[in-house]
Amino acid sequence: MAFRVGSGHDTHRLAEGRPLILGGVRIEHAKGLVGHSDADAVLHAITDALLGAAGLGDIGDLYPDTDPRWKDADSRLFLIETLERLNRLGWRTVNVDVTIFAQEPKLGPVKAAIKLKLAELLGIAADCVNVKAKTGEGVGHIGRGEAIGCHAIVLIEELTTEAQRHREDMRRDLT
């Protein structure tokens, strides 16, 4: 059985008039992240990490911000399509470790909700997901409250033929 590790990073600036979505969870805040899509830095970092682990490039290769199809797109779509791509290639997610860098808002109260949403989206147990939140301590664009960044590390494993068949059967049963 083969394992691979991937690392992803994303940063978006904050601006008024945008929703703040992190890890697929909408967070009440006066500002939201700016981007071509919904700018969910957590899902972008995880998607990038998964693509990297599988040797498939990065999120900009598959979902370029120059493509109007992705304007205001829900970042869950990027993650789900990436997971399906990995599954077709015989890989599954083992665990993910995420660090969110934000001066504001304070993320302690929403870390558990983000963790549960990520576990649901990734199709793994909640104890295989970790979410940490750090501030910028007043330093740089994150520390000044101008942006939010995220770093993600994922571990994927190659599925056995039997496990692949089981997942395909489960998917058919759901449709």
Region locations from a protein language model:
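C-terminal binding/interaction regions
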Residues: S7, N95, K106-G108, K115-L116, ...
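Short, low-complexity, charge-dense intrinsically disordered segments
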Residues: T161-T175
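N-terminal charge/polar-biased segments
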Residues: M1-F3, E157-L159, T175
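RNase III-family endoribonuclease catalytic core
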Residues: A2-A112, L121-L122
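Short beta-strand element of the conserved SAM-dependent methyltransferase core
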Residues: I100, V154-I156, R171
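Aromatic-enriched hydrophobic runs in primary sequence
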Residues: E84-L86, G136, T175
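Intrinsically disordered, low-complexity segments enriched in polar/charged small residues
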Residues: A49, E137, D169-R172
